[in-house]
């Protein structure tokens, strides 16, 4: 990724990473609003959540949010050399495939990520920042998609 884009990503992430659980919750609330069919994929100890609010307040799901935000943090840290995360992201893709996530759902996750960034950053979420994050997310999904391909 080009240096100016990397800097936009790092700069914006510094703001988000001050409250990762809060912003991660915004991301997943948006995800469930856009694609409610994903809610049943999140079950802990056999417990099916009755609503997005029920899911978003469960300690197990909050732990999942923390993990997702750590993956984003790793991508930001390695934004100029995502190949260092290739094996990990492919493995993460396999895990998501195994629990029934469709590869097509990652488009909605991307929309939700951009929504969260916009809500968090306000006017600092410029078109250039949006483009930079879209490119980073696309590269992450490309690596994760290898987990569906079996590569």
UniProtKB/Swiss-Prot annotation:
Tissue distribution of the protein: Predominantly expressed in brain.
Record's catalysed reaction(s): Fe(III)-heme b-[protein] + nitric oxide + H2O = Fe(II)-heme b-[protein] + nitrite + 2 H(+)
Enzyme class: oxidoreductase
Organism name: Mus musculus (Mouse)
Gene3D superfamilies the UniProt entry points to: Globins (1.10.490.10)
Protein name according to UniProt: Neuroglobin
Role, per record: Monomeric globin with a bis-histidyl six-coordinate heme-iron atom through which it can bind dioxygen, carbon monoxide and nitric oxide. Could help transport oxygen and increase its availability to the metabolically active neuronal tissues, though its low quantity in tissues as well as its high affinity for dioxygen, which may limit its oxygen-releasing ability, argue against it. The ferrous/deoxygenated form exhibits a nitrite reductase activity and it could produce nitric oxide which in turn inhibits cellular respiration in response to hypoxia.
Enzyme Commission no: 1.7.-.-
Family under the similarity heading: Belongs to the globin family.
Biological processes per GO annotation: cellular response to hypoxia; oxygen transport
UniProt subunit comment: Monomer. Homodimer and homotetramer; disulfide-linked. Mainly monomeric but also detected as part of homodimers and homotetramers. Interacts with 14-3-3 proteins; regulates the phosphorylation of NGB. Could interact (ferrous form) with G-alpha(i) proteins (GTP-bound form).
Domain Globin positions: 1-149
Molecular function GO terms recorded: GDP-dissociation inhibitor activity; heme binding; metal ion binding; nitrite reductase activity; oxygen binding; oxygen carrier activity
Cross-referenced PROSITE patterns: GLOBIN
Factors inducing expression: Up-regulated upon oxygen-glucose deprivation.
SUPFAM superfamilies: Globin-like
Posttranslational modification: Phosphorylated during hypoxia by ERK1/ERK2. Phosphorylation regulates the heme pocket hexacoordination preventing the association of His-64 with the heme metal center. Thereby, promotes the access of dioxygen and nitrite to the heme and stimulates the nitrite reductase activity. Phosphorylation during hypoxia is stabilized by 14-3-3 proteins.
């Amino acid at each position: 990724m080009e240096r100016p884009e990397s800097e936009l990503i790092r700069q914006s992430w510094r703001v988000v990473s001050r409250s990762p659980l809060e912003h991660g919750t915004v991301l997943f609330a948006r995800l469930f609003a856009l694609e409610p069919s994903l809610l049943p994929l999140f079950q802990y100890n056999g417990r099916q959540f009755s609503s997005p609010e029920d899911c978003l307040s469960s300690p197990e799901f909050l732990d999942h949010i923390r993990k997702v935000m750590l993956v984003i943090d790793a991508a930001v840290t390695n934004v100029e050399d995502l190949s260092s995360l290739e094996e990990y992201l492919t493995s993460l893709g396999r895990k998501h495939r195994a629990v029934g996530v469709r590869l097509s759902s990652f488009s909605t996750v991307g929309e939700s990520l951009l929504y969260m960034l916009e809500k968090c950053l306000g006017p600092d979420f410029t078109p250039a920042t949006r483009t930079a994050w879209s490119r980073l997310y696309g590269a992450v999904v490309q690596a994760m998609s290898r987990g569906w391909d079996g590569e």
